[in-house]
Amino acid sequence: MLKSAFWGGIASGIMVGIGGTVYLSCENKVVGATLFSVALLVICLLGFYLYTGKIGLFIEKPDKLSAFALPVGLAGNAIGAGLTGFGAALVKPALVETAKKMCDAKLEGGMLKGLVAAVFCGILMYAAVKTYGTKGTLVGIIFCIPTFILCGFEHSVADVYYFTVASLAKFDPMSIVFILVAVAGNTLGGWLLPVLTGLAKGKEQGNGAK
């Protein structure tokens, strides 16, 4: 499972990086955000490992092996997204300045804003993956991904890609802190809906037993 999480994590990071590339390349942000969905579509359909999709499912059925797989998969995600960032900057040098402006705005917004934005992204990522896993529909992916992008919510793996591209203009050490904050926010957001769902079901069962 750890091997699968690592290599599948790299594959997911690459796909997220490709999604980030098309988003940065589009002048029309609605079009770019919609096309970004190709990343999660491929990840879900091919069964790759994406931390932001797995963390919410983990809290539903936690186990030791999955707990070890999460950081391994996240490392793979970061490697894949980072390598894609370097490759995209080589193929499309104009993206560097675009990414730098975006990342400068992220850092200027502060860590608290980044954390809250990442929580909202985590909620939408869980919703997208859960609806695909339980209902077999891609509707959640097609709508949730553009929604978090157009809202300006923070996806930690996508941020690895954006900050990697931006670093080719100028590296800011605070970008690493920002990404870690985004990971924390995505984790909290990914846990929120399953925890609330569990509490709701527990309440219903308690009422039914009376």
Where are these regions (language model features)?
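Alpha-helical transmembrane segments and their helix-helix packing motifs
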Residues: M1-K210
